[in-house]
Amino acid sequence: MAAGDLLLRTQSGLPVLARAFPSCLCLRVPARRRRGAPPLTAAKVDVADAVGRRVRSGGAAVPKRRRSRRDAEEEEEEGLAFSRVVTGRGRGVREEGVAEGEAPEFDAAKSGDESGGVDGSYLSDTRFDQCTISPLSLKAVKDAGYERMTQVQEATLPVILQGKDVLAKAKTGTGKTVAFLLPAIEVLSALPNSRRDQLRPSINLLVMCPTRELAIQVAVEAKKLLKYHRSLGVQVVIGGTRLTQEQRSMQANPCQILVATPGRLKDHVENTPGFSTRLKGVKVLVLDEADRLLDMGFRRDIERIIASVPKERQTLLFSATVPEEVRQISHIAMKKNYKFINTVKDGDEETHAQVSQMFMIAPLDLHFSILYDVLKKHVAEDADYKVIIFCTTAMVTKLVAEILSQLRLNIREIHSRKSQSARTKVSDEFRKSRGLILVSSDVSARGVDYPDVTLVIQVGVPADRQQYIHRLGRTGRKGKEGQGLLLLAPWEKYFLSSIKDLSISEATVPSVDSSTQTIVKDAVRKVEMRSKECAYQAWLGYYNSNKTIGREKSRLVKLAEEFSQSMELSVPPAIPKQILRKMGLNNVPGLRST
């Protein structure tokens, strides 16, 4: 027995060796087992409790750190969750179990679909067996159900395999994840075994993603491609999780491939012993959805990470758009002779042709009733309905989900205030199911594939044109038809000028009868006051940051009062003075403070 092992017995006396890893419990049962011995399921709770106490008291020591502004911001935006570890190490690729309260188990074989979320219109005529990849990778690719390469993969894979730095302009849903993972895995598999088999190997492939959902999705894809690369492993470190849990997981299950969100990656560089040393082995650095990484304010973190990895490396940037800021970071991160590969055809970066786009302009106090009416009709017309409703903020998302749940619609919600385990569970359920309505903030706008979405509704003005397009892109995928509806208040109509070149037309606002309005208002009244207070504060913050609407503060206050009235409140909620100061709204007449 090794340190940390426990010798347990079932009720019939069968000896079981339990090895406690920081994030899991492995049970080893002797090969010779008495006939009729009882299963271990009844003893699982006691075993988990015993090992949990041991791990908590004897886990690896990690340094305490000061709570940074980044922590506070991530908790505010991302919520709290637990870490997730995906491993593909050793014989028989497996996934480590997770303790109670952590993110639920997910399996590469069960996540997504066989086509990897790729629209068939993006497939090329080139097969994977026609390119120079190893037999192990080719076998994994075939097992994953991939036969033909997408146009993005066809254009980028040969160049990346030559070892060149690449800036690729590529839309989500076009196979870009495999486009950077497959050649990177080829680089890693060619490294000397001594570099890959050591107890704590260097991190050789580092992938940075803007969101937790995308990071998990990339790791799942990597796990598929690593199926026959027995000595390579992948892990995920993501914002909003327990740093100490991730530190212990990386000690117990060292990996060569790390997928991370930038803020959490920076945390590990600053607070995890030996982590910076492991980054010195990075051979390939990937920035996935580089434009969104920069839009979310991660530039400083990215620059620090770039400074932490070797200069002699291969760098890959994949981005749906290539604005000036992406070009600036490419000059910092990449060699001067990098290749720019544009896989987006003129006009193709816009919405899918199969999506019917409509907008409605209606007073704010009718939005909930109109939303309910539209959903009822869509559910009645399509038995296989699958709807995503995008809201402006996480707390407004929560409010809308609670109202629609009161109206007895089949609702799921996903946003940054949900724990990672809850988000993963909802995301997996929505991906695999039909007959569901997902109310979401922008965590689902890009990089996450949900097949067969029949309708996308955007409630409130999007932040910009690109956000509108990316949200709409959740439907009309793989050549299938879809519908999009943008629901705006009269004072949000200005946004239409930014999408006037798209095929969008005005829809007639439904005349919601008085009985339906009464039902909806009753549902709104049943929502807890705390949810309304949080939604009001978040709504005010969102529109205050809008350059058009937030410019005139007195008008903004009146609009916020309209939103408050739509929640069936006679008086707008009070907001803490500290929050108002941060918004620049302290001493603005009409706002109540605490």
From Swiss-Prot:
Enzyme class: hydrolase
Catalytic activity: ATP + H2O = ADP + phosphate + H(+)
Molecular-function GO terms, alphabetical: ATP binding; ATP hydrolysis activity; RNA binding; RNA helicase activity
Domain named Helicase C-terminal: residues: 370-520
InterPro entries listed in its UniProt record: DEAD/DEAH_box_helicase_dom (IPR011545), Helicase_ATP-bd (IPR014001), Helicase_C-like (IPR001650), P-loop_NTPase (IPR027417), RNA-helicase_DEAD-box_CS (IPR000629), RNA_helicase_DEAD_Q_motif (IPR014014)
Pfam families according to UniProt: DEAD, Helicase_C
Domain Helicase ATP-binding: 157-340
Positions contributing to ATP binding: 170-177
Motif Q motif mapped to chain: 126-154
Region listing for Disordered, in residue ranges: 56-80, 92-121
Motif (DEAD box): 288-291
Protein EC: 3.6.4.13
Keywords: ATP-binding, Helicase, Hydrolase, Nucleotide-binding, RNA-binding
PANTHER family per the UniProt record, alphabetical: RNA HELICASE
Domain notes: The Q motif is unique to and characteristic of the DEAD box family of RNA helicases and controls ATP binding and hydrolysis.
Protein name, per record: DEAD-box ATP-dependent RNA helicase 25
Record organism: Oryza sativa subsp. japonica
